[in-house]
Design a protein with these regions (language model features):
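An N-terminal hydrophobic leader/cap segment in hydrolases
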Residues: 1-40
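Alpha/beta-hydrolase superfamily serine-hydrolase fold, recognizing
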Residues: 6, 27, 34-293
Length: 293
């Protein structure tokens, strides 16, 4: 497909989300959290849209989590996960409404996330934030989070996150779904091929910013502490296990919480062991920020 055909298909997918995307409890935190709408224009990117979510009762400057949603780089998602995290961990959560593929493709989403984090750190007082942050991503958002973290190490133009949170991340865009070891229905395989075509345009799909699971341990020697959430029924399970072992070999402090009966997207889509997984993340965020105070 050419870019026009990719866009038409992506717009149709966005207009017809699966029923399970309509998660329960969307407004359950309306009274105990606040959601601020923000826009900035910096660098060569278009205007960046993001939300800052914080506990409604909290008035002091807060450390913050930057959360990058999943959706194959082509879908928008709601901010319920971010609201739960902010409320439970007594922190601010910045949810970036990154520009979607195929209109915007690699490395655009990485660039704008890096720009936003630098902006928040340099203007922390304006946003009532502290200058320490955690980076979080689910599925394709985990891919972006890995890439931004790698840049913070390699280019030294961004403060490294205090913690990296990865949930069932898409970490190998090089290997065709037919050649991956995990069970995956043919329809899902076609979806992953489509997502890749939307996100990449004349790019080597084997580089660390695109397929971190295939990179050697030397790439990750200065990686921050990392917490990984993975499901035993996730079609991306093996590439997440591979990155986990690579981080171990690199000497990174890394922990994986594995839920055998959970599938891809379970934590945000509120399936299987989602409550346990979210609680683990909430507790870890609280722990890390308390150490950095």
């Amino acid at each position: 497909m050419d870019r026009k055909q990719l866009l038409q298909k992506a717009e149709n997918i966005r207009a017809n989300p699966p029923a399970f995307f309509q998660v329960a409890g969307l407004h359950e935190l309306d009274e105990v959290t606040t959601v601020e709408d923000h826009f900035i224009k910096e660098g060569k990117t278009d205007t960046i849209h993001f939300y800052i979510i914080r506990p409604a009762s909290e008035k002091k400057p807060l450390p913050f989590v930057v959360n990058i949603h999943g959706g194959g780089m082509i879908r928008c998602r709601d901010i319920l996960f971010a609201r739960r995290l902010a409320y439970a961990s007594d922190c601010a959560v910045v949810s970036i409404d990154y520009h979607l593929a195929p209109q915007y493709f690699y490395p655009y989403q990485i660039d704008e996330t890096e720009i936003l984090i630098n902006h928040l750190l340099q203007n922390a007082a304006q946003y009532h934030l502290r200058q320490n942050y955690i980076l979080s991503g689910q599925s394709s958002g985990g891919n972006i989070a890995c890439a931004v973290t790698l840049r913070s190490i390699q280019k030294r133009q961004l403060q490294k996150p205090a913690l990296l949170l990865l949930a069932y991340s898409w970490l190998d865009l090089h290997t065709d779904p037919n050649d991956k070891p995990d069970d995956c229905p043919d329809e899902r395989k076609e979806q992953y091929r489509f997502y890749k075509d939307c996100y990449l345009c004349d790019v080597d799909d084997n580089i660390a910013e695109v397929s971190p699971a295939l990179s050697p341990s030397s790439v990750f020697r200065e990686f921050p502490e990392t917490l990984m959430i993975e499901g035993g029924l996730d079609e991306l399970r093996e590439e997440n296990l591979r990155l986990f072992m690579t981080l171990c070999d690199a000497g990174t402090t890394v922990q994986m919480q594995f839920f055998p009966e959970s599938m891809h997207g379970f934590m945000v889509n509120q399936k299987a062991d989602w409550k346990k997984a979210q609680k683990i993340i909430q507790q870890k965020v609280s722990e890390v920020f308390s150490e950095k105070m």
